[in-house]
Structure formats: C-alpha cells, structure tokens
Amino acid sequence: MLGLIGKHLTIDMYGCIFKTLDDVDFVKETMLAAVKEGNMTLLNFTCHKFEPQGLTILALLAEGHMSVHTYPTMSYTAVDIFTIGEQSSPNQSIRVLKQSFKPEKIKTTNIKRGDVGSLSDMKPKIKLSTTPMRRVRDTSAKVFKFLSRSR
C-alpha cells in the first residue's frame, strides 16, 4: 500500500448570517482561528472583496491551503481545506467555521487525494488495439501496389 498523500475537505454551508459573509475582518479572523485549531501553519494570506458583496480569501499553508468563498445574497459559504501530513487536523477547523458562520445546514465531503492503493494501480491501463494500425498498413500496401502497376 502506497498510502494517502493528502486530505481534501469541501464544506458547503447554507443559511449563514448575511452580514458576516461580507465582513473581511470577520472572515479573516475566522480563518486564522480555524488554521490554528487545525494545527496548521500559515505562510501567506490574500483576499478579494467583490462588489456589491462577496469575498474570496485564501490561506497558503505549509501543509496545503484553505479557501473561503462567500455569497452573502445566497447566505452560502464554500470552503476548501487541503492538507498533507498527519500533524494537521482539518476536521477541527470545521468546528470553528461552523461556530462563526452559524449555518442552518452543512455538507462536508472528504476526498482522499493521492490514494493510489498499490504500485500496480499506478500503471496506466491502456488497451491497445492493433487493428487500426493493421488497416493503415494494409491500405498503404494496396495503394503502393496500385501506383506501382500504373507505370
């Protein structure tokens, strides 16, 4: 077994509080708390505020990344957390995000990244068919034979 390379969580939060989703400082502090709670190391932070509302905030982590996209008019927040290694706990980060955004409904999807299973799983599974190549070769031979007779 080769093992798992990373954990990727996608979190959809529905029915969040409108005013918090357009507050850059609030979302930034929430993310910083989630990073800390998840035992992750912040390397860089960037955000963009859309007009008339909405945010995209990205945290570059030593272990991966965290992104938050807010849609205030829909009371919706989309979060991605990708981590590698065993020291981080992205599931702990979700608790902080839930406490802050207070969604009415949440959907979390866990994706195992890089889980290839065994070395044989990594080999490409390509089905080769010689029939098309044989047809090209046979057709070429027929054309060549035909052209040779014409002279």
What are these regions (language model features)?
Residues M1-S67, Y71-R151:
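Polybasic/polar functional segments that serve as interface/processing modules
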